[in-house]
Regions:
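N-terminal single-pass transmembrane signal-anchor helix
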Residues: 2-30
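Low-complexity, S/T/G/P-rich flexible repeat/linker segments used as non-globular hinges
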Residues: 123-132
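Extracellular/periplasmic head regions of type IV pilus-like filament subunits
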Residues: 54-122
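Conserved hydrophobic/amphipathic alpha-helical signal-anchor segments
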Residues: 24, 28-74
Length: 132
């Protein structure tokens, strides 16, 4: 009796199952890593806005702005940082941005404090509050 060369059906099925499991695990890790990367970008942006508000805006004016309506309010940072990872700017009138600037204790457009917040995917919201 001659022996045939090749793979059995069982060997082929097992190989396909192993490859399928590997592909699923790879994509699960990739999705998780992408979300963590977006969260890091959000933290960088919030920190940049925070330091621009504290070291730039407040140092020059002795108060905080009531709104951040455009990048010109905080010219000390890269204007691209005002746009969240999904492309929605902080001042979007329709909302939907991952970034929120909430001024507090305001009088005539001059505010005594604020809160910066970013909605995160893999952890709690990232929040920075004014120093003063």
């Amino acid at each position: 009796m001659s022996k045939k060369k090749g793979f059995t059906v069982l060997e082929l099925i097992l190989a396909i199952v192993f490859v399928g499991i590997f592909v699923v695990l790879f994509f699960m890790q990739k999705v998780n890593a992408d979300a963590m990367d977006r969260d890091e970008k959000r933290k960088v942006a919030i920190n940049a806005m925070f330091y621009a508000l504290e070291e730039g805006y407040y140092a020059n004016n002795q108060y905080y702005p009531e709104k951040i309506e455009n990048a010109e309010v905080l010219p000390w940072i890269d204007p691209n940082l005002f746009t969240d990872p999904y492309g929605v700017p902080l001042w979007n009138a329709e909302g939907g941005s991952n970034y929120v600037y909430e001024s507090k204790n305001c009088e005539d457009g001059k505010c005594k404090s604020y809160e910066l917040r970013s909605t995160m995917e893999k952890e709690e919201d990232y929040v920075k509050t004014s120093r003063n």
